[in-house]
Amino acid sequence: MAYGTTLSQRATSLLDTVAPKGGLVTAAAAAVLGSALLAVSAKVQVPFWPVPMTMQSMVVILLGMAYGSRLATATVLLYLLEGLAGLPVFAGAGAGPAYMAGPTAGYLLGFVLAAGVTGWLAERGWDRSPAKAVAALALGHALLFVPGVAWLAVLFGAEKAIAVGLTPFLAATVLKTALGAAIMQAAWTVVTRRSRV
């Protein structure tokens, strides 16, 4: 099925289109690659105003769009397990259980929610329409911020949580949403052209 047009229909994911006969090995390789991309995207900082940005949130939601809900969620959970085990996969130097229960805990939960929901929307064809892709990626970013800011509010109060955990990242989020939608449209254009050859 090329497009999912109702909530019960499932469209083929970008990964399934590229590797239609992929099985468990393909899924495992994709999960490992995705968790590596998350780790790299956490470490690379891009100068931006008012604060430098990483591309990690965009990678989370693009994994959802490209992999579909189940594999994207599994990929993000693998990434979090790597961090829980103490591997240096997060933006800072910290890792392990104490780090994951700290101020970033809500955002880490948000990664799982964002990947799962954007993947679910992609399975219904939202990754193929520019407007729907923007909407799906914006929703993915919102799902990332809601638990992140909520947990910061528990730790530091609502006003400080919004001031340090949301407001400085809004401009970068708009940019990453637009860039992510453009990447998905370009990826589908390339895949569609190759399938016609």
Per-region residue spans from a language model:
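Membrane-embedded alpha-helical hairpins and interfacial helices in multi-pass inner-membrane proteins
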Residues: 125-197
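Short helix-perturbing small/polar motifs within transmembrane alpha-helices
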Residues: 3-19, 26, 33, 40, ...
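Peri-membrane helix termini and adjoining interfacial loops of integral membrane proteins
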Residues: 2-11, 84-89, 157-160
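Hydrophobic alpha-helical transmembrane segments
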Residues: 28-32, 58-62, 72-78, 104-109, ...
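Alpha-helical membrane-inserting segments
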Residues: 37, 41, 45, 63, ...
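Hydrophobic transmembrane alpha-helices
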Residues: 2-73
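Alpha-helical membrane segments and adjacent membrane-interface helices in multi-pass membrane proteins
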Residues: 42-116
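Juxtamembrane/transmembrane-helix boundary motifs in multi-pass membrane proteins
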Residues: 18-22, 26, 48, 90, ...
